[in-house]
Amino acid sequence: MSLGESLMKPTAMLYRNLVAMEVEESIRGYPIDAVVLLGGCDKTVPAQLMGAAGADVPAIALTGGPANPAIFRGRELGVGTDLWGYVNELRAGRMSQSDFDELEAASMPSVGHCPELGTASTMAALTE
């Protein structure tokens, strides 16, 4: 299950709740006594916890941890914050598509959740 929340309307929280319902129904739909939750985002981890709580089964949650910092042309990027600024630069014609493609390729250099100190890190710490 994944939330591709780019430009989501009306709100990403609606989709977090839908994922929580999907997790709960997936747990209820199989004859299991407990569940291991693997997640790593500020919406998916809470959704998994909400779903497991709703299904009322024992659960262990493991988060993926933060990704390595993203570097673009010698500058560290905030994946969630800086990327939106570059999208605006692209839309305004101040950045070429090939430069944006290069930025996009550099934006997530390893596995893990968004590396900046944000809600994904907070949710991982709270979950652990």
Predicted regions and their residues:
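Active-site cavity-forming subdomains of large catalytic enzyme subunits
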Residues: M13-E128
